[in-house]
Amino acid sequence: MYADVSDNARIWHNAHVSGHARISGKALILDNATIKDHATITDNASVANNAIVCGQALVKNKAMVLHYSVIGDDATILNDSVITSMAEIVGDAVIAKNTDYEVFKNNWSSGRSFTYTKSNHIWCVGCFYGTGQELIEKAYADSETSGQNYERYVNFVEGK
């Protein structure tokens, strides 16, 4: 397993690149960022501030992934998009502009952030990955308070 760093890409400030990751096209990886597996960062994209890009994820076209965010599976981030606020973007999500995802904070129990991606209509909450209806059902199974709160977020975001 060898990562490939080429075409004026730069790795700085304790960044980590491993597996079969490909960094090229003047991409910049810095500040404790991790790029691993078969992830690709290219075309002036940047990953920094403890962010992780893994799986087969692709970050390109001046996109930036920052602040403990996680991009994984087959997700694609492009077109100057900025991913921040501990977002977790996975599956087959495509983020082409900043309004293609939302990050919220669970302020009623765990304090954990959770993410909605518009391209695939998926919610990512800790270990949970699924539709709004699946999230509501799981949350009610956990507690009435969680169910009510997640249902409010799903209804707000999905316009129900």
What are these model-predicted stretches?
Residues Y2-N98:
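A detector of tandem-repeat and repeat-rich interaction/domain scaffolds
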Residues K26, K105-K160:
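Terminal amphipathic alpha-helical/low-complexity segments used for targeting or macromolecular assembly
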